[in-house]
Amino acid sequence: MRFIPPQRGFNYMSNERLVAAANQFKRLLLDNKLLVVAVVCTTVYLGILDNVLESETMKLDEAAYWLIVENLRQPWLTPIMESFSNLATPVTIVVLWVLVTAFAPGRRVGLCMGVNLILALALNQAMKAIVQRPRPEGFRLAEASGFSFPSGHSMVAMAFFGLLVWFVWRYEKDRVRRALIIVALCVIIAMIGISRIYLGVHFASDVIGGFCLSLVWLVFFTRIIAPLLTADKDIESTPNSTQ
């Protein structure tokens, strides 16, 4: 029997199909970015939760303690970290919510922010009651009560400032201003989480778990609830909201 090599046209079509499939998969990911974020965050959160429930000491927590508590703490830095931490306290969040309600375009943005915050807090308290992880001991620079996982400050920061990011992305027309505001809000979110580790009231896994759970909640909220609450003609949509 004589060997017949495959035709070039077959290879060409196979490669063409692979490229087409790759492009289709890429478009699918781009069209469902929030879903991808939710899946990744859910995976990370469940992985951390499994370790917490098993009462295992995570290398993540040990590394964060070494880096932030043992090597980063300085007398001049502590007041700065306390200030960032205070941005997610009830009084500060209420003041910020009032300001957003007063100055945001449309009449329903404040309602949306309030509903989001209340539900995120309820989710946080429910998870804390289920997991009941004790807070770290022996190196606190601030008073804190209640359970540790997931971090309430981290969840509030991501829920409140993260929803602000969503609003800015949808309704701010100036691209430079939009980018600057979003970067500033993301820095605030990150610094609030870091400050909780620095002050010794949370493990790093508490903070990352709080961020992940809150991001999953935000994906659900912005896809299902927020569009219903913000269906206000007074809010003018930008091209970003139609893409």
Model-found features: residue ranges?
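N-terminal transmembrane-helix/juxtamembrane module of multi-pass inner/ER membrane proteins
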Residues: 2-90, 129-131, 135-141
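Membrane-embedded catalytic cores of phosphoryl/pyrophosphoryl-handling enzymes
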Residues: 5, 15-18, 97, 140-243
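Interfacial segments of alpha-helical transmembrane regions
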Residues: 32, 36-40, 97-120
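Aromatic-anchored segments of alpha-helical transmembrane domains
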Residues: 44-47, 119-126, 187-196
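Short helix-capping/hinge motifs at transmembrane helix termini and TM-loop junctions
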Residues: 53-55, 104, 131-132, 173, ...
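Membrane-helix interface segments
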Residues: 76, 106-110, 136, 174-180
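Alpha-helical transmembrane segments at the extracellular/periplasmic loop-to-helix junctions
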Residues: 91-95
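The feature marks cytosolic C-terminal regulatory regions of anion transporters and related permeases
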Residues: 105-142
